[in-house]
Amino acid sequence: MVFEENSDEVRVITLDHPNKHNPFSRTLETSVKDALARANADDSVRAVVVYGGAERSFSAGGDFNEVKQLSRSEDIEEWIDRVIDLYQAVLNVNKPTIAAVDGYAIGMGFQFALMFDQRLMASTANFVMPELKHGIGCSVGAAILGFTHGFSTMQEIIYQCQSLDAPRCVDYRLVNQVVESSALLDAAITQAHVMASYPASAFINTKRAVNKPFIHLLEQTRDASKAVHKAAFQARDAQGHFKNVLGKKY
């Protein structure tokens, strides 16, 4: 469910879920983790760009076709483990990583983007963390935003559940650069080339030190987030939202 190609020393990983909004299904998660591992192990690759594809979303979050089925405790626990493992897979890449965000980055897609060293955003894209208004727990998102952007910003984003356009994302410092959609991938690759030119040893060891507490934070939130999501899914408050999104496919 991904395409992999190189632009000189930059590996471009393009998400290719059949749905243009790239919801994170189990298969897409595995494909992304495997692609990141290949890029990390390839000495010819000096930086990595992850992109949702032209006229597609970066990721609209969890795949509701799968998430709607979560009810048993063990299934919810396994799903949270998958989510945390995906995020840690990005943080463990020892090369520069760039997220090129177009369309929507919703929920899990928003959180996934925050794992990257740099984020570039199309001027028409939107970040959204809407979980709470739909009856879905947001403890993982809260932990991530609290770490990356501070407690007050985290509170605003997860409690207001609003769509954040490019100017608001810049205000919150969620992104490093905003460009036109047609220029997004080229701009991300250009930034990746800049960072790929840094001496490898200094970058690798600095990044490892920088990301270590972030990885530890995600590990710490596993059990607490399993409890939060069990309570939320077992209340079944989210089922109406899943039905509205999926329609006849529900």
UniProtKB/Swiss-Prot annotation:
Offer one Pfam family short name for this entry.
ECH_1
Record keywords: Signal included?
no
- EC number(s): the record gives 2.3.1.226
UniProt keywords (A-Z) are:
Antibiotic biosynthesis, Transferase
> Which family does the similarity line name?
Belongs to the enoyl-CoA hydratase/isomerase family.
Asked if Transferase is a keyword of the record, the answer is yes
The impact of changing M108A is: Forms the C6 epimers of 6-methyl-t-CMP in 45:55 ratio of (6R):(6S) epimers
The gene behind this protein is carB
Pathway the protein takes part in: Antibiotic biosynthesis; carbapenem biosynthesis
PANTHER family for the chain: ENOYL-COA HYDRATASE, MITOCHONDRIAL, ENOYL-COA HYDRATASE-RELATED
Miscellaneous field:
Unusual member of the enoyl-CoA hydratase/isomerase family: in addition to decarboxylation and thioester hydrolysis steps, catalyzes C-C bond formation leading to a substituted heterocycle. Glu-131 is important in both C-C bond formation and thioester hydrolysis steps while it does not play an essential role in decarboxylation.
Q: Per UniProt, where does malonyl-CoA bind?
A: A60, G61, G62, D63, F64
Its UniProt entry gives the catalysed reaction(s) as:
(S)-1-pyrroline-5-carboxylate + malonyl-CoA + H2O + H(+) = (2S,5S)-5-carboxymethylproline + CO2 + CoA
Quaternary structure note: Homotrimer.
Chain's role: Catalyzes the formation of (2S,5S)-carboxymethylproline (t-CMP) from malonyl-CoA and (S)-1-pyrroline-5-carboxylate, the first step in the biosynthesis of (5R)-carbapen-2-em-3-carboxylate, a beta-lactam antibiotic of the carbapenem class. Also catalyzes the independent decarboxylation of malonyl-CoA and methylmalonyl-CoA and the hydrolysis of CoA esters such as acetyl-CoA and propionyl-CoA. Catalyzes the reaction with a C2 epimeric mixture of methylmalonyl-CoA to give a 55:45 mixture of (6R)- and (6S)-epimers of 6-methyl-t-CMP, under standard incubation conditions.
Identification of the protein by name: Carboxymethylproline synthase
Alphabetical list of InterPro entries matching this protein: ClpP/crotonase-like_dom_sf, Enoyl-CoA_hydra/iso
Q: Where is this site: Important for catalytic activity?
A: E131
Top-level lineage group: Bacteria
GO MF annotation terms: transferase activity
Query: What processes in GO biological process is this protein linked to?
Result: antibiotic biosynthetic process; fatty acid beta-oxidation
